[in-house]
Amino acid sequence: MSLDQAIPEALQALRTRFGAAVRAEQATGEAFPVLWLDASVWEAAHRFLREEIAAPFPLLADLWAIDESLRQHRTGQPASRITLCSHLVSLVRNADLRLKLATDGRAPSIAGVYANADWYEREAHDMFGLDFGRETRRILMPPTWEGHPLLKTHYARATEKPPFVLTDRLFEAEERATITDPDLLGLPKLRDGEELMVLNFGPHHPSTHGVLRILLGLDGEEVVWAWPDIGYHHRGAEKMAERQTWHGFIPYCDRIDYLGGVISELPYLLAVERLCGIAVPPRAQMIRVMLCEFYRIMNHLLFYGTMAQDVGAMSPVFYMFTDREKGHEILNAITGARMHPAFFRIGGVAMDLPDGWDAMVRGFLDWMPARLDEYERMVLRSELFRARTVGVGAYDTDTALTWGTTGPGLRATGCDWDLRKLRPYSGYEQFDFEVPLGQRGDIFDRTRVRADEMRESLKIIRQCLENMPEGPVKADHPLTTPPPRGAMQKDIETLIAHFLQSSWGTVVPAGEATGQIEGHRGLTQYAIVSDGGTQSYRTRIRTPSFAHLQMIPKIVPGMTVADLVAHIASIDFVMSDVDR
């Protein structure tokens, strides 16, 4: 089945099966179809697409909501107070499909179809108050929170609400809210008549790699059940996007995953550029690719060192941090920052490469291969490391897709899925590189895949060095690039346009667009909605870490606590990416 045939065939099968309940296909600028469904077939349609159709859609990449109450540009869309959106992916078809449901605040659950829908529905309940007809706990906000933050009626800034006063009564209520009763979660306290020990692992434990709490039920050292508790790092990033200009939100992207640098900026900008119809110049595209691969290496070096450290090898992390410092010196010279560069712009990058960039990059490329060889001897060939990781925390491709796992965690199972190859963006189709794969899907393979990915990133960076084109680094487009100063001095209309762009911000056409990339942790996706203004009406941020943590209760029962620590390290997440 060709790519051109893949989606029409799926849409026809869906319409044949559900008839008029497939209400309309929304006209968008997306690279995939967007369908509206009746609530009566919401669950059944998802089951059909996941289990019954040929070449199914096994991956629920995302599920989120939109408060439509203040939106003005909705031509051709059904009336809706809160719209529920699901984003499905078929690996066989290499195609996506988005389904939408118009709701009055109530929606059927699909958690019985896609296991990973549980956390996404909890988030939609938490942020929008959606009722899924089942018990739904808050997930990002504390249980004492009043209101639903992503509703348009909820305040966006602290200055819009009365001053906070911590009374004794409120303090006691907040303290009680931190106590979690396993009975209320449906978790057993007994095993074979013996009482389990309930352990709070985190939120301030070094092996949780951030403010993450995992409630554990232990029989001795064996993990019987695990319940992750997230949200401690939640900063309201999606709400912030509604209050910033389109350009002004770029620095916030860096903070979604503070180890990813410009990688976190790219999907947001791809979405805005798609909506605006902006073509990025070739030189800017290649600069973007080079910097993304640099930050991929920076992240993987940190993972590599802490992964070894969490199973008892203390030396590698110090050597790897030394090499990260070399990389960060180059990134600082190019972007002006190490970890939060805010360097990409709508239509290109902030500035051209500095003098001498090529010598710095070449020195790094000559240095790193031998270092990676040394790390392989220190870590991957270590009998102790292999004893702690081979066969531990293993899962197969079907399990990975069921729980929304992408990136190295999916490729470690042998699944060849990398958007840089399958759906090239920013010019990745020009580069020659391989996609490292594992076989067993265990901790060792997840480590091996990331180690090999660094070698491939070095190959990509070298090709950037040797083939960097000449030309501008920003599109000549009125929505992104200020007019020439000479024109502003002669033409009052040009001066006015520049003033409005600089003061009010870019006015993005009304519509919807999605940007997807193969991030260092997996699928990173921004879905934006513009209502024809200078700010986003809705920005949905799909991060890989959120999906990956939800898998913990499925994988860790039967492990020891020490193996749990190793498994957590092998996921490679940061809590800012989870909580946003």
Curated annotation (Swiss-Prot):
Cystine residue pairs = none
What ranges does the record give for the region NADH dehydrogenase I subunit C, renumbered to this chain?
Answer: 1-171
* Keywords (A to Z) from UniProt: Cell inner membrane, Cell membrane, Membrane, Multifunctional enzyme, NAD, Quinone, Translocase, Transport, Ubiquinone
Q: Which InterPro entries match?
A: NADH_DH_suCD, NADH_Q_OxRdtase_suD, NADH_quin_OxRdtase_su_C/D-like, NADH_UbQ_OxRdtase_30kDa_su, NADH_UbQ_OxRdtase_49kDa_CS, NDH1_su_D/H, NiFe-Hase_large
Tell me what topology the record assigns in the membrane. Answer: Peripheral membrane protein
EC number annotated for this UniProt entry:
7.1.1.-
Region NADH dehydrogenase I subunit D, as annotated, extends over 195-580
Q: What's this chain's function?
A: NDH-1 shuttles electrons from NADH, via FMN and iron-sulfur (Fe-S) centers, to quinones in the respiratory chain. The immediate electron acceptor for the enzyme in this species is believed to be ubiquinone. Couples the redox reaction to proton translocation (for every two electrons transferred, four hydrogen ions are translocated across the cytoplasmic membrane), and thus conserves the redox energy in a proton gradient.
Relate the assembly described in the record.
Answer: NDH-1 is composed of 13 different subunits. Subunits NuoB, CD, E, F, and G constitute the peripheral sector of the complex.
Instruction: Write out the similarity annotation.
Output: In the N-terminal section; belongs to the complex I 30 kDa subunit family.
Q: What is this protein called?
A: NADH-quinone oxidoreductase subunit C/D
